[in-house]
Amino acid sequence: MGMSIKSKVLQKESPEAPFKVVEIERRDPREDDVVIDIKAAGICHSDIHTIQNEWGEAHFPLTVGHEIAGVVEAVGDKVTKFKVGDRVGVGCLVNSCGECEQCRNGQEQNCLNGNVGTYNSEDVDGTITQGGYAQKVVVNEGFVCTIPEGIDFDEAAPVSYTHLTLPTSDLV
């Protein structure tokens, strides 16, 4: 897609540091990616444990948030499921290899080559992913779900990650 994605995020420099609003540059979107303008993000216990480094291995500076709802702002040339203006949600994953047995069987959370978490994971470009307490996020289209009209973003965000456990990728 060849576009630079800048986003203000709510980030901590360390577990002890206060949250700060800073601007980051998201990775360049690829042809199978969706750029989302975030409208709401839920707060999950895992966000709290991670940002406080209670589970170890947190990579700082860090922006958490994996319950995301927003509007599609841009799509890559090979994106087929979404278009600009669609209402969408994102859960705890933003990518996987897509090729191993687990991924081919719809079990991307068990990717044998390492899935990419919404935050605190190594992304496809080698950077550490930053979560949804932000203005924008870049996600592989396979990890985006539709939010139907009539459901508020703040209601959809906390359940957006459930599309990984449901037999459908839509919140209907």
Language-model-detected regions and their locations in the chain:
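Conserved small/polar residues in nucleotide/adenosyl-binding loops
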Residues: 162-168
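Short structural boundary motif marking the start of a folded domain
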Residues: 3-9
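Short Gly/aromatic-enriched secondary-structure transition segments
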Residues: 50-52
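Cysteine-cluster motifs in flexible loop/terminal segments that predominantly coordinate metals
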Residues: 92-136, 141-142
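Cytochrome P450 core scaffold surrounding the K-helix E-X-X-R motif
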Residues: 46-48
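Short pre-catalytic strand/loop immediately N-terminal to key active-site residues, enriched for Gly-Thr
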Residues: 151-157
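Glycine-rich beta-strand-centered segment in the early N-terminal region that forms part
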Residues: 25-41, 54-104, 109, 130, ...
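Extracellular beta-rich ligand/substrate-recognition surface
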Residues: 11-18
